């Protein structure tokens, strides 16, 4: 394992920073940080409130697009800083596409004259809250504007229809070309952006996946890290879905452009509420791991079992040279008649220490530190740390010392023995420990969601680099927390 993983846990404390303002005064479902900007989108009631991570206060609101509660929101990645795109998923069985053009910094002459040390990005976010003069649509009359509601900087541009019941979750692929939505109707839909330009907003359904046997609670795309391209018989995009049927499914697009289920992850004894991919690239080139949390009170870590022999065999098939390459398929280079089975083996390599005594609703994996956070129905926040297994580390060190005096023919045997010693919970010779926990994070209320995000507030030592936790609860309050170690 990389040296970044410490040999043992250290003490830590979860300390409140302050709640985002204003309070939402009704159940809030989830808060999603923008991938690059200091913005946080919180789904609640029939709207989405966008908070500034700089001021920890409201930046703008998206209202009028849905007839029932908004359950989820996702930012589209890859856009310039002055343009925003967000998808909201609602209990009204639709997903809505919203756009915001933030060229308002130029429209606010005061923004350029402020004596302030904020970055241009910070000035732009601040200025955008002042300049609310742009109409949502130049062709709308006053009645249409009042019906749309919310801040006039946001334009509700498209409704995605097709689900038969509540949309539980939505997520963009890392490229932004695909959008996944899931629903109480037991299906996962994949939509593709087919517009000629970003402003076209033309999306078509490319897959409807119906293999789950219960409500689909969550979808998550594998992050864009080098290791995700290792499986050459598929495209680079990998989607995971979690369900009321107690399973997680892994989906990939095959060489014929069909989305197929390549693995079913079984082990939970209750609804799988949430999933999240490992965010940090693994130094050893390992495929990203996956976290899942469940109504059974557990958090599990899943890992793809790499088949190196199979990968090497694939590389050797399909002919050599330009003629051979031309005759191969674009994905993997294996003719249909020679392709291996579209299946992957995933194993549960860890069940994190039991702390929660009720449903675990949400988990989050820090990209910066590798810490895992969880929360749920019991109102607790729990932090976990992955550590080198002490017995494995000791044996490896002992073997290294012994091997210095052994003949070369015996060194490989000794090394093989050392690397095969792993903890019961992990194939990587690591264990998971509870770093700290906090009870009653939102008082007597359930906590529905937790996420890591970067800090931009004035109290941060390194704005844009430091991390904090954000929790969202039934009390309608979005809270920020610092992890002190």
Regions found by a protein language model. Name each.
Residues 2-26, 55-57, 149-157, 343-349, ...:
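A short helix->beta-strand "capping" segment at the edge of beta-propeller domains
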Residues 20-46:
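Beta-strand-rich domains and repeat architectures in extracellular enzymes and scaffolds
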Residues 43-45, 88-92, 175, 181-185, ...:
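Conserved strand-to-loop turn within each blade of WD40 beta-propeller repeats
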Residues 48-52, 95-99, 188-193, 219, ...:
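WD40-repeat beta-propellers
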Residues 451, 462-485:
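Blade-level signature of beta-propeller repeat domains, shared across WD40, Kelch, NHL, RCC1
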């Amino acid at each position: 394992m990389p040296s970044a993983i410490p040999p043992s846990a250290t003490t830590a404390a979860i300390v409140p920073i302050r709640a985002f303002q204003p309070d939402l005064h009704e159940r809030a479902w989830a808060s999603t940080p923008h991938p690059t900007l200091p913005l946080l989108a919180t789904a609640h009631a029939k709207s989405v409130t966008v908070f500034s991570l700089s001021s920890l206060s409201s930046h703008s609101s998206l209202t009028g697009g849905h007839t029932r509660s908004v359950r989820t929101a996702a930012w589209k990645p890859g856009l310039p800083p002055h343009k925003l795109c967000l998808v909201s998923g609602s209990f009204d069985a639709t997903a809505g596409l919203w756009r915001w053009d933030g060229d308002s910094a130029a429209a606010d002459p005061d923004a350029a004259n402020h004596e302030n040390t904020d970055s241009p990005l910070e000035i732009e976010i601040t200025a955008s809250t002042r300049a609310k003069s742009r109409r949502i649509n130049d062709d709308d009359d006053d009645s249409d504007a009042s019906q749309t509601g919310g801040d006039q900087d946001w334009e509700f541009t498209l409704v995605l229809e097709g689900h038969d019941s509540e949309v539980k979750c939505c997520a963009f692929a890392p490229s932004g070309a695909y959008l996944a939505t899931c629903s109480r109707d037991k299906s996962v839909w994949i939509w593709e952006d087919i517009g000629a330009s970003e402003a076209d907003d033309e999306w078509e359904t490319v897959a409807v996946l119906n293999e789950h046997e219960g409500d689909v609670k969550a979808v998550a795309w594998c992050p864009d890290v080098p290791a995700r391209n290792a499986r050459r018989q598929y495209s680079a995009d990998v989607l995971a879905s979690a369900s009321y049927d107690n399973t997680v499914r892994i989906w990939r697009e095959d060489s014929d452009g069909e989305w197929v289920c390549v693995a079913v992850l079984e082990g939970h004894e209750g609804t799988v509420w949430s999933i999240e991919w490992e965010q940090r690239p693994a130094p050893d080139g390992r495929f990203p791991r996956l976290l899942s949390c469940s109504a059974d009170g557990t958090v599990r870590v899943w890992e793809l079992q790499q088949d190196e022999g199979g990968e090497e065999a694939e590389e050797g098939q399909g002919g050599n040279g330009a003629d051979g390459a031309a005759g191969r398929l674009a994905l993997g280079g294996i003719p249909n008649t020679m392709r291996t089975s579209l299946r992957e083996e995933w194993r549960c390599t860890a069940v994190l220490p039991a702390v929660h005594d009720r449903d675990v609703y949400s988990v989050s994996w820090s990209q910066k530190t590798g810490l895992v956070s969880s929360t749920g129905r019991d109102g607790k926040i729990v932090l976990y740390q992955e550590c080198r297994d002490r017995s494995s580390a000791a044996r490896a060190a002992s073997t290294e010392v012994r091997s210095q005096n052994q003949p070369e023919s015996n060194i490989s045997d000794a090394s093989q023995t050392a690397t095969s010693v792993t903890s019961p919970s992990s194939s990587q010779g690591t264990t998971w420990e509870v770093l700290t926990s906090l009870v009653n994070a939102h008082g007597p209320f359930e906590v529905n969601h937790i996420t890591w995000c970067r800090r931009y507030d004035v109290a941060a030592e390194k704005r844009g680099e430091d991390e904090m936790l954000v929790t969202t609860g039934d009390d309608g309050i979005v809270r920020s927390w610092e992890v002190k170690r």
